[in-house]
Amino acid sequence: MLTRKQIELLEFIHKRLQRDGVPPSFDEMKDALDLRSKSGIHRLITALEERGFIRRLAHKARAIEIVKLPEALMGSMQGGFAPQVIDGDRLDPPVGAMPVSGIHAVELPVMGKIAAGTPIEAISEVSHTVAVPGQMMRQDAEHYALEVKGDSMINAGINNGDIVVIRETSVAESGDIVVALVDGHEATLKTLRKRGNAIALEAANPAYETRVYPAEMVRVQGKLVGLIRSY
């Protein structure tokens, strides 16, 4: 059974598809449901997807397929229902925008901040979304983004405030820059080095020491595949 907010969001998306042929933005969804942050929209969309009402298409910006509607909505919809895919790439570009051939953007959730310094408490709450070139990502994997906090990776070209694009994986090789979860609750962005039965998390700044942990204390959460910087 869907919650009232889930039904409201599904109805809003469906009506926008029928009217405009393009999906509402996350900001529009947030305003329509009178929510204070877009993280609430992400949770609702995830719940609808898990229950089989919508499907998000990988590597297409804001592409949503409505699979079915609940009975509570079917009676109020005229003309029947047919699943359809709404491709966010069809939105009109801003005035003055220049077309870039062969590039399309994927909207990724920014799952909070990651420490490039001393490990901080792991954050898994969506703070906002960011448009990422689809070429950064593999089609057979999930991805997310994090905002960098700290300067321990500056010699690897990663600065405080950068957005890093992470491919979800639990496997990494020595020398990979990874998101590592230490002791189950502290997350950090570091270069991973395997040392026998231990794992070293190495900074790219001489001001920070390399930290070494028993292998069972470190869990790889993902591997760095790209970086976005605002000037």
From Swiss-Prot:
Represses a number of genes involved in the response to DNA damage (SOS response), including recA and lexA. In the presence of single-stranded DNA, RecA interacts with LexA causing an autocatalytic cleavage which disrupts the DNA-binding part of LexA, leading to derepression of the SOS regulon and eventually DNA repair. InterPro entries: LexA, LexA-like, LexA/Signal_pep-like_sf, LexA_DNA-bd_dom, LexA_repressor, Peptidase_S24_LexA, Peptidase_S24_S26A/B/C, WH-like_DNA-bd_sf. It is an enzyme of class 3 (hydrolase). Signal peptide: none annotated. It comes from Dinoroseobacter shibae (strain DSM 16493 / NCIMB 14021 / DFL 12). The keyword Membrane does not apply. This is LexA repressor. Residues 26-46 bind DNA. Belongs to the peptidase S24 family. One of its GO terms (molecular function) is DNA binding. It catalyses: Hydrolysis of Ala-|-Gly bond in repressor LexA. Its EC number is 3.4.21.88. The record marks A116, G117 as: Cleavage. CDD domains: S24_LexA-like.
